[in-house]
Structures are given as structure tokens and as C-alpha cells.
Amino acid sequence: MDTKKFRGSRTCGGGTHKNRRGAGNRGGRGKAGACKHHFVRAMFRGYSYGKHGFNLPAEISRDVSIVNVGELDELAPYLVEEGLAEIKDDAYHINLENLGIEKVLGSGRVMKNLVVTSEGFSASAREKIEAAGGSCIDAE
């Protein structure tokens, strides 16, 4: 909007001298009037109000470190090279407790004979490891 044509007038198109002074001209600052006179506009724009969902207390929730069986199958030779796993009886023996991994999940393919020690296994991970001739040892 070209403002040159408003120059010389007292309020330059801002209405009366009382307008364009503070937030009262705009119905408040920020979210003021959010559940009152601004509510209908906000409803059509899709704003959400109020609390939603549930947060677990920090002492209950924790992050579980995981690895997939497909990744284990690929990493087994490298773990032996690094001294983090060993080969006994034609099987890769991997202790995931030493690596800080708590659970094994079943995504991927298992082609090698793996003997895995871990705190937890998903049903599909246990099934795939045992189908390839390996075994799952639950660490307690």
C-alpha cells in the first residue's frame, strides 16, 4: 500500500488519533483473547488449545539401545577383528552387554551362525537367529 497519499493527514489512515497506539487496537498481544474473541478465527485456522496427550515420568521411561539381526550379521566379522566378538565352533559369539546394547530386533536377514548374548530379543529376532543355526542366550 502506497503511504505517500496519506502524508499530511493527522493519522495517515490509522483511523482516529486513538488507534495505532497500543495492543488494544489489535485485541491484545500474542495469545490474549485466545479462548474468547479470537477463538472463531483460530478455530478456522486450525490452532489447537489446551493440553494434549500424556508424558511418562522420566524415572519410568528410558531409551533402550537396540540392534537389528541384519546389522549383527553384517558386523560380525568386523567385531571379531576389533576383539569385541570371537569365533568358537564355527559360530560368531557376540556378547551385546559388553557393547552396551540391550535388545535385538528382527529386521534383516541372518546368513551366519550367531550365538548372541543379550538382555532381550524380539520373537522374530530369536526365530531368525535360530533358523540360521545360531542361538540366543538371555543375560540376566
UniProtKB/Swiss-Prot annotation:
The superkingdom listed in its UniProt entry is Archaea
Q: Which InterPro entries match?
A: Rbsml_uL15_N, Ribosomal_uL15, Ribosomal_uL15/eL18, Ribosomal_uL15/eL18_sf, Ribosomal_uL15_CS
Q: Where is this region: Disordered?
A: 1-31
Q: Which Pfam families match?
A: Ribosomal_L27A
Q: Which keywords does this Swiss-Prot/TrEMBL entry list?
A: Ribonucleoprotein, Ribosomal protein, RNA-binding, rRNA-binding
- Transmembrane ranges? none
Q: Name one GO cellular component term.
A: cytosolic large ribosomal subunit
Gene Ontology molecular-function annotations: rRNA binding; structural constituent of ribosome
The biological processes this protein is annotated with in GO are: translation
- Quaternary data: Part of the 50S ribosomal subunit.
Q: Can you tell me which family this protein belongs to? A: Belongs to the universal ribosomal protein uL15 family.
Query: What's this protein's function?
Result: Binds to the 23S rRNA.
- Could you tell me what this protein is called? Large ribosomal subunit protein uL15
